[in-house]
Amino acid sequence: MIKNKILTATLAVGLIAPLANPFIEISKAENKIEDIGQGAEIIKRTQDITSKRLAITQNIQFDFVKDKKYNKDALVVKMQGFISSRTTYSDLKKYPYIKRMIWPFQYNISLKTKDSNVDLINYLPKNKIDSADVSQKLGYNIGGNFQSAPSIGGSGSFNYSKTISYNQKNYVTEVESQNSKGVKWGVKANSFVTPNGQVSAYDQYLFAQDPTGPAARDYFVPDNQLPPLIQSGFNPSFITTLSHEKGKGDKSEFEITYGRNMDTTYAYVTRHRLAVDRKHDAFKNRNVTVKYEVNWKTHEVKIKSITPK
């Protein structure tokens, strides 16, 4: 049962001022309270911020678990939004006969904290996932019991649950690093189906073709041979669960990073054939990092900074 306590929380003037920038958009946050039984509540906050410069949007849901039967504060952070692919086609300025495709080999998603009183206790997804569609559930039972189910349809009855669901066709999700203070995922190009069969994401000739015209775009395969993560971008859906020692500090800061690593494929015609060159991670860590401050007592969430501005 959701109580009718929907409030509009506006960022303080002193917070907005340092972030004022034509390349950044911050939306208002919507707040809700959900009764999950036995006197426990989930206090929900949402923050949206967009970097127009890097074409990245973070939509972050902060669910505070208020449970008298759990001896710690708990926070479930669901990371959503959009990371544009920024795939481009162009001629090299000094050598216009060489055509270039810049495309995302990897999407980056991470959360970390430096707070000694905060620990990462769960996260989704876990391990390596190579399925095109990813669906998992995090569940909570009164008393501090967090569990994860393999899919949205997984068995188990929870007082509260949160799901993730996203498409990663031709890509694979890997946990690159994880410890008590954070987790980092990489959603990496894996393999692609081409007219010549299955091709590795590391293949030198991937996406290049005999030109169908003089433009840079004509040197690379058409859109119907490219997956959504290259044509348009990636919609992340990841979860972290964090615990906080009660009575040890009212506020904590978290840094959430979204971004991409870009590969470059070069193509040009020699006298006898199409020549192709490839540079892996040509543009690495094209990321946006947003620092959020959460208040464990008032359950407020504020945006402290964004890098780059």
Swiss-Prot record:
<comment type="function">
    <text>Toxin that seems to act by forming pores in the membrane of the cell. Has a hemolytic and a leucotoxic activity.</text>
</comment>
<keyword id="KW-0204">Cytolysis</keyword>
<comment type="subunit">
    <text>Toxicity requires sequential binding and synergistic association of a class S and a class F component which form heterooligomeric complexes. HlgA (class S) associates with HlgB (class F) thus forming an AB toxin in strains producing both gamma-hemolysins and leukocidins. HlgA and LukF-PV can also form a complex.</text>
</comment>
<protein>
    <recommendedName>
        <fullName>Gamma-hemolysin component A</fullName>
    </recommendedName>
</protein>
<keyword id="KW-0964">Secreted</keyword>
<dbReference type="InterPro" id="IPR036435">
    <property type="entry name" value="Leukocidin/porin_MspA_sf"/>
</dbReference>
<dbReference type="Pfam" id="PF07968">
    <property type="entry name" value="Leukocidin"/>
</dbReference>
<keyword id="KW-0354">Hemolysis</keyword>
<dbReference type="GO" id="GO:0051715">
    <property type="term" value="P:cytolysis in another organism"/>
</dbReference>
<comment type="similarity">
    <text>Belongs to the aerolysin family.</text>
</comment>
<dbReference type="InterPro" id="IPR003963">
    <property type="entry name" value="Bi-component_toxin_staph"/>
</dbReference>
<keyword id="KW-0800">Toxin</keyword>
<dbReference type="GO" id="GO:0005576">
    <property type="term" value="C:extracellular region"/>
</dbReference>
<dbReference type="GO" id="GO:0090729">
    <property type="term" value="F:toxin activity"/>
</dbReference>
<dbReference type="InterPro" id="IPR016183">
    <property type="entry name" value="Leukocidin/Hemolysin_toxin"/>
</dbReference>
<feature type="signal peptide">
    <location>
        <begin position="1"/>
        <end position="29"/>
    </location>
</feature>
<keyword id="KW-0843">Virulence</keyword>
<keyword id="KW-0732">Signal</keyword>
